């Protein structure tokens, strides 16, 4: 069973850059998107054999998530059920017979770390939400988690220590989340692999130089780890400042 996650940084723009062909070539069972940056009715996008679920931000052209699936879920939940967090289209949960699939786009701490305090609250509430699901059945979490966990996960750790996405506070929240019973699928297979990134700034020819960050993840409940077949970063796929990431589970 194949899962794809991609921060498209504006779905309408990516549709004009070959999204349909990329979607078809990856042939995922579940294809999760973050930063769709659109409202209901702005794009008529459907694929044969797939159902789709969308969570839009109240603010136009901002955030937003979506999931395309070949498998009809038992239920669909939008957001965390906490009003403070549920106006930016950041979370969709599909309940499947044997697992939950959660795609998410946590809030960026922003320049000057002006949203760091809110990000800390969001992280704590999101972890509690995931633990509640995990108590019922295993969980697969994917998305642009807006944090590079370890120094190995970005090209220039020393110069980014106090920047959004690599603060000690954000990294510690990721450590806490993993400690709550989750496995980072990519590091499970490649614990020491360097220069493996999923996001590159549009500035300074960063992608050409592979001066990137690994901030797009698949996390799985620890008890699913032995069912993982592969984890892949598709850095050959363009169209966004992020590339898609993939998880394959044995059926």
Predicted segments with their positions:
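N-terminal, active-site-proximal structural segment of metallo-dependent hydrolase catalytic domains
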Residues: 1-47, 51, 57-63, 78, ...
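Active-site beta-strand termini and strand-to-loop segments that position acidic
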Residues: 70, 94-97, 221-222, 247-251
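Surface-exposed cleft-lining segments at the edges of enzyme active sites
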Residues: 81-82, 107-123, 158-163
């Amino acid at each position: 069973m194949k899962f794809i996650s991609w921060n498209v940084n504006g779905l309408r723009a990516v549709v004009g850059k070959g999204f349909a062909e990329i979607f078809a070539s990856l042939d995922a069972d579940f294809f999760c998107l973050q930063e769709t940056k659109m409202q209901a009715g702005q794009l008529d996008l459907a694929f044969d054999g797939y159902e789709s679920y969308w969570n839009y931000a109240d603010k136009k052209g901002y955030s937003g998530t979506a999931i395309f699936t070949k498998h009809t879920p038992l239920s669909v939940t939008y957001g965390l059920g906490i009003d403070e967090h549920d106006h930016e289209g950041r979370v969709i949960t599909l309940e499947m017979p044997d697992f939950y699939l959660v795609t998410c786009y946590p809030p960026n701490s922003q320049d000057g770390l002006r949203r760091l305090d809110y990000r800390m609250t969001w992280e704590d509430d999101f972890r509690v939400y995931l633990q509640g699901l995990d108590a019922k059945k295993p969980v697969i979490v994917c998305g642009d988690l807006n944090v590079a966990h370890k120094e190995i996960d970005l090209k220039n750790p020393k110069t980014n220590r106090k920047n959004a996405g690599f603060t000690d506070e954000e990294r510690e929240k990721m450590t806490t989340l993993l400690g709550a019973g989750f496995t980072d699928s990519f590091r499970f297979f490649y614990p020491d692999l360097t220069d493996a990134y999923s996001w590159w700034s549009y500035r300074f020819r960063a992608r050409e130089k592979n001066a990137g960050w690994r901030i797009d993840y698949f996390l799985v409940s620890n008890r699913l780890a032995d069912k993982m077949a592969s984890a892949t970063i598709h850095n050959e796929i363009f169209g966004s400042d992020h590339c898609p990431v993939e998880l394959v589970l044995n059926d």
